């Protein structure tokens, strides 16, 4: 029932703004006051804090405008026929728009609030991950380029029945680079990139979650060409009919199905990109909405070799090409995440050596580096002793060696099991394709 107060308030606002714009201030003032009374009554019953905040903001705006009009009327101005110049002078630079509560282009306060929350999902700064940083996955990269890069740079390619792909599902074991690939897409694509998770789209308020989904796709269409990346989509779109499925969850899935169907059949330049570790958990109707279902497997030896180089970056090391080949062969069964963790651990090995060292030598440039007792110029001292002498800034850890990697690999194990791989390979045979 309390929603009637809000609707009545909005109706009065529309009339008030209309009269205000026409300069009929003696008519606009009572209409503003009526709107304020209805908004005040609505606020007593409104439980949603976001909506309360939005209405309070508009209430303050209309109250300020009503006070300005009252001041004009007190001076004898009632509209264009009486002291119109004075009335114009008192107008605020931005008056309320003739719409539902004064939001953008007639948006009501609730929709404005939903969109404000989704704005944080837009990736404003490029993640700075290039295609070349993604090791392997050539088929997946080619398919994504066909869907993302070519339609923007070469729109003339897509004529007649040739249309770019509209929905991609990336699936595979954890840590294989699905989200990393999405970051590369965000970097390389000249498109608006929306990165969302279930927490961005699920609300505790009844009916708000599906509105968030609807607004997300609407914003993507307005910003086209655009990409919507949904990470861990299985948490949003599990199989329907399960015992633990709530009514809210069902409505989110239904809205997502409707929106994706719309994206697929209209040339709106909106690409949906989703990732999951559990493809079998997806609802079959959602699964069907994805044109391309690409398996992101564990990296091969060559890809792992490339990953070691990328993660080491410009950190000082003395590894040769045969050393990197050895590491690629040695890490069979490792995911991209496993390789990343391995390198992070290795990066600290020189620091550990420096902390434990009993001998240091002074290089020609004045820096001190740990060494063995037989190294030319070796001096028996410790890192703490050098720091006490004011040489802390001159201490440099040694470059990374193959031995450092062997030491770390001796204690690290892959995180993906054989049974995990079997599940994804079976799904690929039934529904997907190799990446």
Curated annotation (Swiss-Prot):
Task of the protein: Involved in the transport of biosynthetic membrane proteins from the prevacuolar/endosomal compartment to the vacuole. Required for multivesicular body (MVB) protein sorting. Catalyzes the ATP-dependent dissociation of class E VPS proteins from endosomal membranes, such as the disassembly of the ESCRT-III complex. May also regulate cell cycle. Required during seed development for the formation of mucilage in seed coat and testa. Involved in the maintenance of Na(+)/K(+) homeostasis under salt stress. Required for cell expansion.
Gene that encodes it: SKD1
Principal localisation: cytoplasm
Family per similarity comment: Belongs to the AAA ATPase family.
Stated name of the protein: Protein SUPPRESSOR OF K(+) TRANSPORT GROWTH DEFECT 1
GO BP term (any one): trichome branching
Residue ranges annotated for the MIT domain, each copy included: 7-72
Keyword Repressor found: no
Species this protein is from: Arabidopsis thaliana (Mouse-ear cress)
């Amino acid at each position: 029932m309390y929603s009637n107060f809000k609707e009545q308030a909005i109706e009065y606002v529309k009339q008030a703004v209309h009269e205000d714009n026409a300069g009929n201030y003696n008519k606009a003032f009572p209409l503003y006051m009526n709107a304020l009374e209805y908004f005040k009554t609505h606020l007593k019953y409104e439980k949603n804090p976001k909506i309360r905040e939005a209405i309070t903001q508009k209430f303050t705006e209309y109250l300020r405008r009503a006070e300005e009009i009252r001041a004009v009327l007190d001076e004898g101005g009632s509209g264009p026929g009486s002291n119109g110049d004075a009335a114009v002078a008192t107008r605020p630079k931005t008056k309320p728009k003739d719409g539902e509560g004064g939001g953008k282009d007639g948006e009501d306060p609730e929709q404005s609030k939903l969109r404000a929350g989704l704005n944080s999902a837009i990736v404003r700064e490029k993640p700075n991950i290039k295609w070349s940083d993604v090791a392997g996955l050539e088929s997946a990269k080619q398919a994504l380029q066909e869907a993302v890069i070519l339609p923007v740079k070469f729109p003339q390619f897509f004529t007649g029945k040739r249309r770019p792909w509209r929905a991609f599902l990336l699936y595979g074991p954890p840590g294989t680079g699905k989200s990393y690939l999405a970051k590369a897409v965000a970097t390389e694509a000249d498109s608006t990139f929306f990165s969302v998770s279930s927490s961005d789209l699920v609300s505790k308020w009844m009916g708000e979650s599906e509105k968030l989904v609807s607004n997300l796709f609407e914003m993507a269409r307005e910003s086209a060409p655009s990409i919507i990346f949904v990470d861990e989509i299985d948490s949003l779109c599990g199989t329907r009919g399960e015992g633990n499925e709530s009514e809210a969850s069902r409505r989110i899935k239904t809205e997502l199905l409707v929106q994706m169907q719309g994206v697929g059949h209209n040339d709106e330049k909106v690409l949906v990109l989703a990732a999951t570790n559990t493809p079998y958990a997806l609802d079959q109707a959602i699964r069907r909405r994805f044109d391309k279902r690409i398996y992101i497997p564990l990296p091969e030896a060559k890809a792992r070799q490339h990953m070691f180089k990328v993660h080491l970056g410009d950190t000082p090391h003395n590894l040769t090409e045969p050393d990197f080949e050895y590491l690629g062969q040695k890490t069979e069964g490792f995911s991209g995440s496993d390789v990343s963790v391995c390198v992070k651990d290795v990066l600290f090995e020189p620091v550990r050596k420096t902390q434990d060292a009993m001998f240091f030598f002074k290089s020609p440039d004045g820096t001190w580096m740990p060494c063995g007792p037989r190294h030319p110029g070796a001096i028996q001292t410790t890192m703490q002793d050098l720091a006490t002498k004011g040489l802390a800034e001159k201490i440099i850890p040694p470059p990374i060696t193959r031995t450092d990697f062997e030491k770390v690999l001796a204690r690290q194990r892959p995180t993906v099991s054989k049974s995990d791989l079997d599940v994804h390979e079976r799904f690929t045979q039934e529904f997907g394709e190799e990446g």
